[in-house]
Structures are given as structure tokens and as C-alpha cells.
Amino acid sequence: LEPFYEIRWPDGSYFQASGDDEKMQSEVQRLNPADLPGYKRFLKDSQKRYIIGYEGMVAEPMHRLWETLKVLPTFAMLRADRSIYGLAARRVKDERLRMALSFHPLFIGGDPMHVTSIYALVAHLEKTYGVHYAMGGVQQIADAMAAVVRAQGGQIHQNAVADEILIKNGAAQAVVLTDGQRFDAPLIVSNADAGHTYDHLLRKHSRRRWTTGKLARKRWSMGLFVWYFGTRGTAGRWADVGHHTIANGPRYKGLLRDIFLKGRLSDDMSLYIHRPSVTDPSVAPAGGDTFYVLSPVPHLGWKNKVDWQKEMPIYRAKVAAEVEKLMPGFEACISTETIFTPETFEDRYLSPHGAGFSIEPRILQSAWFRPHNVSEEARGLYLVGAGTHPGAGLPGVISSAEVLSKLVPDAPVAQSKTRMAAE
């Protein structure tokens, strides 16, 4: 995509992220010319963190403590104890640029005020590889994976809810569904949230490390209010609203504090607007558009959690008022809609506390400190997905599968089927 995304502020200012160095420098200078030298230093910071944090760790197994210990000297040198916002604040003075350089961990469930500055690697990652979109939507990625499974002789059971993983003599033995069906297997891979895997699927098994108490003490990522809607006759309207738009509210640090530290649903908000149909018309009927608008909100683990059955229509109206500023008249064009709240994530995706991105990626909840891809609780049990290493977000989740491919023994596959999968 080009530009990658646009960030907007209430005062009408904006920042367009791009893969073009000159354009990026121009954007920085437009907001605050004095911050250009600091921005260039931040890019160097980002590259150093990319080398150790991405190339050295993301796709590598971290279930052995030594794998994390050996990078600690480099982490110390790079001041991984500082937050990504803290690093950005040391480099640039303009609060808008500080936000633009530090917000990325929000998209993997982390508070930029507290997650490690190692996540500054995203700037170099974007600069090197760009920002991409799978034509046809994320479903196309899932369908392609399913095609490989089936080509290798695998079966996929849909609308089948796992209720328990059976353990015998310290080894994973079988998966039992809620309808009583049982699937025996010498190896089991769980892509349920790690918290759900241990606290529910292994609830009858005595756990050594990932006990209910330990999981309860973890910091979980924020929840999400996600409003999906389609519109009629809007192709070509709101031309300044591209594929990815971030619309900031009046507060950055204060809003993050409410969400992550106080568990309070604020009246103000910052929104991410996704409009894939400007890139890929196939995802909407002719002449129409497909959108979703995402607002970070507290998860359900707080003492005074939000009652979303009551709050949803109220909050929808508040979100609509903000979207109206970007896309005047949009509500009259809506043809279909659905809304996900943290309760949806808890009920539909079995996510603890309705968290959108599983365990928050703080430094002591990352790498070896995160639930391991190789479970300690039972031989032959493996974990994949947002709750394990390397973490949440589409790149992280797919990378966790790459990590697992280095750990799970290969299953025998007929040569003809292997060839089909490769093709």
C-alpha cells in the first residue's frame, strides 16, 4: 500500500506514513522541522532493534530460558527497559510525532507507555518491507492454509468446539469436543488462546507452571469495540479516507491510562478506520464500500467491567459522531452492520477477559516469559497463536506457526499429496 496509512489529529493536522524516505522526512518537517534530526536518529534506533528483536527472535523458538538470556546484554545496551513512547520522546519533541512513532504496539495489544522500546523495530520493518494487504481479505490467507491441510490429507472440522485436552502419563492423548466426540492423537497443537488452553482445556490436569493463579496475575491486552459496516453507492466518496486511517482524539497518554491502567471507558476515543474496498473492490458490492471502525476499550477483567449489553448502542452513537467528521452522511448509506465488543471476543473466540490480543506484550510477558510454543504441562502438546511466542497481530500469529514448524515433528505425507500442496 502507498501511503501505508494516515494519522489525523483533532486540530486538522495529519501525517502520511510512506515507504519513501523523502516523503517521510517531508511529513516530519511539515509537523515540526526541528524534529527531523531526532527522527533520523529514531530510524537508526529502529534498525538496531529490528536486527535483534525481529531477525533474531520473532521466528525463533524461545521456550528455553537460555534463548532469552543470551539476548539480555544487547537488550540492556538498547535500553529495552524504556518504553517505546519513552524512546520516541527522547528523539522528537512534537507530541504528534511521538504518537506517530510509538502507537504501533496498540495493534498487538500493548500500551505504548509501558511496552519495551524494542517494538520501535516496526518503523524499520515498514520501511524495509512496506505495508501489505491480501487481496480478497484475511480470509484468503486462512483459505490458502486450509487448502494445504486438505491437500496433505488433513481434515478440518468446522463448528466443532474443543472442551478438553486429555492427558495420560504426562503426555497429550486426545481432544474431546463439547458434543462428546473424541480425537486421539500423539501430538496436539492448540491455537486457542493460551489462557483458555491452560485454564479450560487442561482444567482437570494438575499444572506446574501455567496455573489459574498465575494466569490471573498476568496483564492482559485491551479489549476492542469493532463496528463492521457496508455502504451503498459510496465508491469514490470521502476520497481522503484511504485504506488505513487513524483518527486521534484529544488525548493520547490519558486515553491509554484509562484503558490499560484504570479499566475505564472514556467519553473520548481514538479510532482506526479500515476501508479495504478502496484497494480491493471485490470485498464490497459494485459501487459500495466495506469498513470497520475499531476503538480500543478496557477488557472485561476489571472489577467494574463495562456492561456492553447496555453500553453498546450508546458507544456506537459516540463512534458514529466521530466517524461523521471524516465521512459526512455515512450512516444514511449503511446497508449492513455488525458490532463486536469484548463480550463477543470472550464468547465467540474464548478469549480470557475478552482481550483482543491475549496477554499484553510487556517485556516480562514476552519471549521465554510468555506461554511457550512447547508446553511444559504435557509432552506432545504445542501452542500457536497470539498468546504464545512471538505474540499477537497477523505477522506475529503467522510467525508463531513458523516457530512451531521448527519444533513439531513432521507427519508422514504421501509424495503425491506433498506435490499438490507445493503447487
Model-derived regions, located:
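Rossmann-like flavin
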Residues: 10-114
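A conserved FAD-binding loop/helix module that cradles the flavin
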Residues: 386-409
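Active-site-proximal substrate-binding core of FAD-dependent oxidoreductases
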Residues: 161-167, 340-342, 409-423
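Mid-domain catalytic core of redox enzymes
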Residues: 163-285
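Helical element adjacent to the flavin cofactor pocket in flavoenzyme catalytic cores
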Residues: 121-179
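N-terminal FAD cofactor-binding segment of flavoenzymes
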Residues: 1-4
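C-terminal segments that line or cap access tunnels to active or ligand-binding sites in enzymes
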Residues: 232-347
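A glycine-rich dinucleotide-binding beta-alpha-beta segment and adjacent secondary-structure elements
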Residues: 94-108, 266-274, 325-390
